[in-house]
């Protein structure tokens, strides 16, 4: 039966346009682009004009961002190491992750958040290390202040996280056509959640001065925590991500399931359910789990039952060198021997009749 004019079939092309990004954030490809700043700025595909302007104007910041890509991708892979999709990257793809992030899924939400957080972390750290011309330590942390332990003096080098957040917002969000399509709004929201996550773990560190370290005087500064804390926090947000739909005027979100609360600025949001990532699917960007190592004794996501999607697994015996027969020698060393250890490794079987990828 034909739908009436103004019905769902009329809205479907517009909905698909809203949900389909042109490409993923191609600035991620800066990790693989070396050479001078001009070479880097002109050869990263897909940068919008504002991003290229910032790239040419702040080549030292771009180098910091490029180095930071390796750090946040490693963190992404750590968090997803026991899952079917393991945040694998494609070296020859300028989107870095391939087609998997074209879907507005939980995984896309996490990657946008962790990448935005990675820019904040990398830029802020470079500021504190004196590597950037446009910033240094936080200039606002001067003079005397108070906390629950009393009065202290600001000293040392407080991480200038406000600069890191400001630059990350200007550079990363520049690609998103804010207010024009659903995916751009989703990306902007998750980018902001990532930036806020880094600041959440900014901590005050102090050094005591006085007789025998009596803390008669204290000098304090603000420092970012290890990036793993941000990764762990965003992982929890990934597991609690909220599915949303566009509101009627196309300017914001509403929850897809009315039983759930409205997302806060700290929550990750997504539109589409994830594929199961069990088999290789070029359209979905999934490499499948054939050849992936699984844990025979686990009951979690890395178990052979879950990881292999019920297809079964192959077992092979391998040997590895380990330290053994360790003894303590006075004083003060532990000396060990090198021993060969045999262990069983379990890997997921391939689908019986499917084109499957090499181990991921």
UniProtKB/Swiss-Prot annotation:
It comes from Rhinolophus ferrumequinum. Keywords: Developmental protein, Disulfide bond, Extracellular matrix, Glycoprotein, Lipoprotein, Secreted, Signal, Wnt signaling pathway. Pfam families: wnt. Ligand for members of the frizzled family of seven transmembrane receptors. Probable developmental protein. May be a signaling molecule which affects the development of discrete regions of tissues. Is likely to signal over only few cell diameters. The keyword Transmembrane does not apply. Belongs to the Wnt family. This is Protein Wnt-2. Its main location: secreted. SMART domains: WNT1. Glycans are attached at residue 295. A lipid is attached at residue 212 (O-palmitoleoyl serine). Disulfide bonds join 76-87, 127-135, 137-157, 206-220, 208-215, 278-309, 294-304, 308-348, 324-339, 326-336, 331-332. One of its GO terms (molecular function) is cytokine activity. Palmitoleoylation is required for efficient binding to frizzled receptors. Depalmitoleoylation leads to Wnt signaling pathway inhibition. It is found in: Secreted, Extracellular space, Extracellular matrix. Residues 1-25 form the signal peptide. InterPro entries: Wnt, Wnt2, Wnt_C, Wnt_CS. Gene3D superfamilies: 3.30.2460.20. One of its GO terms (cellular component) is cytoplasm.
């Amino acid at each position: 039966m034909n739908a009436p004019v103004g019905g769902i079939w009329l809205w479907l092309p517009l909905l698909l346009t809203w949900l389909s990004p042109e490409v993923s954030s191609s600035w991620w490809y800066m990790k693989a682009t070396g050479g001078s700043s001009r070479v880097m700025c002109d050869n990263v595909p897909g940068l919008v004009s504002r991003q290229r302007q910032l790239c040419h104007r702040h080549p030292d910041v771009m180098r910091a961002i490029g180095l930071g890509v390796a750090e946040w991708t490693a963190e992404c892979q750590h968090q997803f190491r026991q899952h079917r999709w393991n945040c694998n990257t494609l070296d020859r793809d300028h989107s870095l992750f391939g087609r998997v992030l074209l879907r507005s899924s939980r995984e896309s939400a996490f990657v946008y958040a962790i990448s935005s957080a990675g820019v904040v972390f990398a830029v802020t750290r470079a500021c504190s290390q004196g590597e950037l011309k446009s910033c240094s330590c936080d200039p606002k942390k001067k003079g005397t202040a108070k906390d629950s332990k009393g009065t202290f003096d600001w000293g040392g080098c407080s991480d200038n996280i406000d600069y890191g957040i400001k630059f990350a917002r200007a550079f990363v969000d520049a690609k998103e056509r804010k207010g024009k399509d659903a995916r751009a709004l989703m990306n902007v929201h998750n980018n902001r959640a990532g930036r806020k996550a880094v600041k959440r773990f900014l901590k005050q560190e102090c050094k005591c001065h006085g007789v025998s370290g009596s803390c008669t005087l204290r000098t304090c500064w603000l420092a970012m925590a290890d990036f793993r804390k941000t990764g762990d926090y965003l992982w929890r947000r990934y597991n609690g991500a909220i599915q949303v739909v566009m509101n009627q005027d196309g300017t914001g979100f509403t929850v897809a399931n009315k039983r759930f609360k409205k997302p806060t600025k700290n929550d990750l949001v997504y539109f589409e359910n994830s594929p199961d990532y069990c088999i290789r699917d070029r359209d979905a960007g999934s490499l499948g789990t054939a050849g992936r190592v699984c844990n025979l004794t686990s009951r979690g996501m890395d178990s052979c039952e879950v990881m292999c999607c019920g297809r079964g697994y192959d077992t092979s015996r391998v040997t590895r060198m380990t330290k053994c027969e360790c003894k303590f020698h006075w004083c003060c060393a532990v000396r060990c021997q090198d021993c060969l250890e045999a262990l069983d490794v379990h890997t997921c079987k391939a689908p019986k009749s499917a084109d499957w990828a090499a181990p991921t």
